[in-house]
Amino acid sequence: MRIAWSPRAVATAARFMKDQEGMREIGAAINALAQDPYPPESFSWGSYRRLRVGPYRVMYAVEAGLITIDRVDRVTAS
């Protein structure tokens, strides 16, 4: 499957560029989606999927051979 980043995803991920290790983990998790777009640690969120990667959440959609990364956010502790 192909992976595409929306402009919003690029903008939201850019806020966390100082966390190089976190960005490497996010990159590895997103690349793994090409092999398995529905890993057991991802959850349905309406028409999106959400994937927790350390302190981050990746929101993405899967459609017709394309995975679109919609946003990357830091998860707040509750």
Predicted regions located by residue number:
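Enriched for short, Lys/Arg-rich terminal
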Residues: 2-3, 14-15, 20-23, 53-57, ...
